[in-house]
């Protein structure tokens, strides 16, 4: 992964388990991304308003449809716009290794490993329209 191209991308990681959140942060920072962290929906909205992310990565407990609603809520209340991709980690409902697009720039994924997630994030960040 080219760290230089990632240095301007901010990824907001929403994860309720400290160890998992810290692990995701380390992996993303090693790839050169700037990372902001949140424990829950409220924390994520505040963080996104302070420093708008280029992508939101949500991995919190709950049924997949509930987590997707929360992720969209974060994007809406932080006034980020639909061009900010939302990626929801899902441990159920879809087959391992799959990625499902649901709605405008919202994806559910259950990666087999970090390399699959890394590839998805890089692709989505490259697809973001550049503001004029």
Language-model-detected regions and their locations in the chain:
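Conserved phosphotransfer microenvironments
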Residues: 58-75
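Accessory recognition modules or surfaces
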Residues: 1-8, 23-24, 54-57
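Alpha4 helix (beta4-alpha4-beta5 surface) of REC/receiver domains from two-component response regulators
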Residues: 68-69, 88-119, 123
């Amino acid at each position: 992964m080219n760290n230089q191209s990632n240095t301007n991308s901010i990824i907001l990681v929403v994860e309720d388990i400290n160890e998992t959140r810290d692990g995701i942060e380390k992996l993303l920072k090693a790839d050169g991304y700037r990372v902001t962290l949140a424990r829950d929906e409220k924390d994520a909205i505040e963080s996104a308003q302070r420093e708008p992310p280029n992508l939101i990565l949500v991995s919190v407990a709950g049924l997949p449809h509930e987590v997707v609603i929360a992720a969209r809520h974060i994007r809406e209340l932080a006034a980020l716009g639909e061009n900010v991709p939302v990626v929801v980690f899902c441990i159920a409902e879809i087959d391992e290794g799959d990625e499902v697009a649901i709605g405008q720039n919202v994806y559910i994924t259950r990666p087999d490993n970090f390399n699959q997630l890394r590839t998805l994030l890089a692709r989505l960040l490259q697809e973001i329209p550049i503001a004029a």
